[in-house]
């Protein structure tokens, strides 16, 4: 899912743990590898245990994700730009927007999160990436279409593993035999992530052996954003997670490829609503 979440008074970043891959035993977040025949489309499943949540900051790193709540009566409020939308059963998101927040109601035992491969997701479900980047959140029906039977079956299962099996069966039913992956775009996305968004687009073009028009067209069609926008998003998210640990503004600015601290502070305020130091005080990070 790659959401940054702050629970109650203790800051816990799901995205930070996904990036570091050090969270499985520490935070009891379960990672399930998809079946081999679906690994071209699905990155991972995450079972994220949670309790009643107050306001939580939320981000997405440009990766398409579906979040499923355990029961039909479970609900969530998702807020962006002071507009609140309510969803039952779960939601879909693919791109980061500034100042988003999540509120879950009741004692929701866990979230089941499905992270897809960006280069394959929209093509898999015949979706328009540009359209789905016009809003931060969408209901599940917008993405999965007529899925009443799937949701009903999932809500009969208490265990996340059973729900995952149902999701995989559903996706196998929509995969076209003629569906071809875009491995070069997958490689571009991986290379940007590997370098934490700090490499230039010229470096990316040189590595892949493609021109900018190819990059822009393929990123736009698959992800609804330009390669530069995606790279900038990766840079901020990695700088954010590093800053929470190191709390060294000047050091993180330099390591993350920002030209100066003012640019990092501007991005930080854009996404969180606070300056880095204000954010640390608000979250009481020690």
Describe each PLM feature range.
Residues 2-186, 193-194, 201-202, 208-212, ...:
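Alpha-helical bundle regulatory/interaction domains
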Residues 202, 216-221, 228-231:
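Long, low-complexity intrinsically disordered regions
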Residues 219-225, 267-278:
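A secondary-structure capping/hinge motif
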């Amino acid at each position: 899912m790659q959401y940054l979440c702050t629970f109650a008074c203790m800051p816990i970043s799901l995205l930070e743990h996904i990036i570091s891959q050090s969270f499985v035993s520490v935070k009891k977040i379960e990672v399930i590898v998809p079946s081999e025949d679906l690994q071209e489309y699905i990155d991972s499943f995450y079972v994220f245990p949670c309790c009643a949540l107050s306001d939580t900051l939320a981000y997405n790193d440009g990766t398409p994700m579906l979040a499923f709540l355990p029961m039909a009566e479970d609900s969530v409020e998702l807020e962006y730009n002071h507009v609140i939308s309510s969803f039952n059963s779960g939601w879909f998101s693919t791109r980061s927007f500034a100042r988003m927040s999540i509120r879950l109601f009741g004692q929701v035992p866990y979230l089941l999160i499905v992270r897809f491969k960006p280069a394959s997701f929209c093509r898999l479900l015949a979706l328009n990436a540009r359209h789905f980047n016009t809003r931060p959140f969408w209901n599940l029906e917008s993405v999965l279409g007529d899925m009443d039977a799937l949701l009903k079956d999932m809500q009969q299962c208490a265990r996340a593993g059973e729900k995952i099996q149902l999701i995989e069966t559903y996706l196998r039913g929509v995969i076209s035999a003629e569906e071809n992956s875009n491995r070069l775009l997958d490689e571009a996305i991986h290379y940007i992530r590997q370098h934490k968004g700090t490499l230039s687009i010229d470096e990316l073009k040189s590595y892949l052996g493609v021109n900018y028009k190819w990059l822009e067209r393929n990123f736009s069609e698959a992800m609804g954003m330009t390669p530069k926008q995606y790279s900038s998003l990766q840079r901020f998210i990695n700088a954010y997670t590093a800053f929470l640990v190191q709390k060294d503004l000047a050091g993180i600015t330099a390591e993350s490829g920002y030209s100066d601290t003012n640019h990092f502070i501007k991005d930080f305020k854009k996404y969180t609503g606070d300056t880095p130091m204000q954010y640390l005080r608000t979250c009481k990070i020690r």
